[in-house]
Amino acid sequence: VNQDLEPLNQEGMANPANRFHPWIYKEHPEVNCIIHTHPTHVAALSMLQIPLMISQMDVCALYKDCSFVGHWPGVPVGNEEGILISSALGKNRAVLLSHHGQLVTGKTIEEACNLALLIERAAQLQLLAMSAGQIQPIPHDLATEAHDWVSTDKRNKVNFAYYARKALKKHSDCI
């Protein structure tokens, strides 16, 4: 489809909820991949209307890199949602959408895929930790160091390759 959601081959129909994607590409020229999903733990956390809290080393790629939309605007079928989500994203690569799900962006497919997996893991850890007590903050300097250490093209490619091998082993008939 083109940015007006018109099918390029004149067949089929675009999902009108994809209308916000062109807004992100327009406002964030560094983005080459968008992944928007509603995974279980992200969806559960979004129902609580609280931001994602990064306080564990393995998910520090999202430290200070995940925005939060606290008000659900409804099904994202109009330009208003594109403006809202694109604006909320700001300089971050991810956004948690209340009562909805998540959206991650990447300069590469590998980066976006890794962030999509990590945001679900982070939400799962947050929900588990919240059920046990009060989450303790991770030291800013260490979290920033971990964020920068894991947020490299090389690590994104290596992580993506690992997940691809794992998926192919489980679903060998997909190719």
Model segments located where?
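Glycine-rich flexible loops
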Residues: 1-175
